[in-house]
């Protein structure tokens, strides 16, 4: 009886251990889908993918041309993570659309630039010029702050403080510039119709524009706009998230960013 009872206890203990191990394994994944933006983000994640594979994590890279789509895809479960946005953009999306998403790691800083097909120096910007800026709140605010830093406009102090500037917050505009909000992806294609346009680095890269060589007005490289990896809140502590972050923060990925982009993208880790 005692031997039988001991065996029964051992079997139950082993079963419990196997169930616990199985549950932990079920929480982890060996294959994930990550949404990135076309261009720079796509190139970086090809390296991340190789590093992650050595750790047994298969990363499927899903490329997006529209900033409005990756968070919706993540929230709906079509993606496991995304890596394309900075914190102000994520905050705005959460507020506007109710996504339950959280950042888990920083990736790169991508300074914003203004580009032109018509002038070579920002000092040559004519009166009444059409100026393209992004129509999403966070990047539009960013473009307006850059115009203010060049003395081209001034903004309401409260809007600057809260990072909520829109064209309606312009207080002075001595050159009578015409601010033209457009979708971020459309701005490179609109350069022939605009005097200058604010273009995010991933779209600039795709259009054959170099931040270091072609931008005529440049955002400081260090600022609050470091990009990040986001996941659903329910997933933030899962082992595969740590493995993904470890792969992105590897020396191999850092070296690739520094050598490939020559200052137009800067590792934020």
Where on the chain are the PLM-derived regions?
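Short helix-initiation/N-cap motifs at beta->coil->alpha
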Residues: 62-72, 159-189
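Pocket-flanking alpha-helical
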Residues: 67-98, 113-115, 120, 204-208
